[in-house]
Amino acid sequence: MSDFLNKRFWKYRGKRIRPYMRNNVKLAGAIIFVPVFLLSMFLFWREQLIHFDLSQVIKNFEWNVPLIIKSVLCSVLIAVGSIVASYFLLFDSYKKILHRQKIAKMIFSNKFYEKENVKVRKIFSNETDSKEKITYFPRMYYQVKNNHIYIRIAMDMSRFQNRFLDLGKDLENGLFCDLVDKQMEEGFVCFKLLYDVKKNRISIDDAVAENGVLPLMKHISWQFDKLPHMLIAGGTGGGKTYFMLTIIKACVGLGADVRILDPKNADLADLEEVLPKKVYSQKNGILMCLRKSVDGMMERMDEMKQMSNYKTGENYAYLGLKPVFIFFDEYVAFMDLLDMKERNEALSYMKQLVMLGRQAGYFLVLGAQRPDAKYLADGIRDQFSFRVSLGLMSDTGYGMMFGDVEKAYVNKKETGRGYANVGTGSVLEFYSPIVPKGYDFMSSIKNALVGVEGAQATAVASGSVSDQTASGEGVSEANG
């Protein structure tokens, strides 16, 4: 019913931007200052005003200089103090006023309006004077809803229409927001922006995977069942390793089969202590893990079709199977170590995993300093539905990660901060989950693993699931 009314009757699109709003902050200040100043002056002069007699004032007029100075100074200070207090107490309202002022100024500075000179008669005179009159001002609307800012611009077939469609980057930079989405509505283009993205950062304890969804920020989640495979890029000190460890912890807590490939034998390789026979650092071991993962995926797909509850279009989760996550860190460095035959073999395995893995529940998470197309050829890179860059990157690096998108990239020296493409086509500012100083990943992953194994043992003992289903595999795979 609401859709019917919205389509055929009036629909609220936000507060319309008017020409006077280019002085919005000054007007808001004056609206606070003037009443407070006058009220304060009245309180100082109330005795004189209550007993005011015009004839006596004219006859015995004298300047009460001390009271005048005192009242004016105090009233000004009180009015200014009211403005300052309003700024802090009503900061959100101030930001809205400032945003509307910036948009109005953008309209004037870019000359997105039309005007003409008209003749007007002077007051108290028969002479005429020329005055500018705005004959066209674009219909732009500003709305704040659910922590997002919506800027709607009417597509009215004016000569500015094509330029309106390309305002996303200007709005993003000018309002210091993150462009989340751009969509066409009936007669309008709508820019959806998020202000102060950092406020949506979550703790590592909140990054808990469930039902095919892993929350990474309050407004960003990796829906790995729908958007399979993740590509993570980031230089030294960008927070890439901690981010991968955070995802590993969440996947272990989910009960997934986690396999780790770390050719540099660095931080991820230390997880051998808590994930025995699941961590590979040598060339032969990594190639073997990739090969056996592909074989296991193919066998699982065949097994799924033989299951009694198999249904066309459903995935591994529908059949009660656990996902398999393969974390491959510094894969570019690994590829550089291989000869041509081995490199083609590794690329073939990776291509099969990313092309066929979603249905069977096999997910690949690649980490590198930058995703060189040399080692992600044949469209493999396009199969990574969720992409994250952390730390400082060049424009070339951003281009490799996200392609040619309308985005104003800003580098900030903050660990765990970067950008993400979450499968919507838009690149969003991103902050990885907060990891407290001194956080022990080894013990937390070990505890998560113990909890999962205990829950699986209980489920098997009760007969609610089979031993195969609890392990997440329909076939036996060697991990040696």
Swiss-Prot record:
Domain FtsK: 217-399
Coiled coil: none
Cytoplasm is among the record's keywords: no
Recorded topology in the membrane: Multi-pass membrane protein
Keyword Transmembrane: yes
Residues that coordinate or bind ATP: G234, G235, T236, G237, G238, G239, K240, T241
Localization per Swiss-Prot or TrEMBL: Cell membrane
Name listed for the protein in its UniProt record: Ftsk domain-containing protein YdcQ
Lineage: Bacteria, Bacillati, Bacillota, Bacilli, Bacillales
Chain ranges passing through the membrane: 25-45, 71-91
Entry keyword set: ATP-binding, Cell membrane, Membrane, Nucleotide-binding, Transmembrane, Transmembrane helix
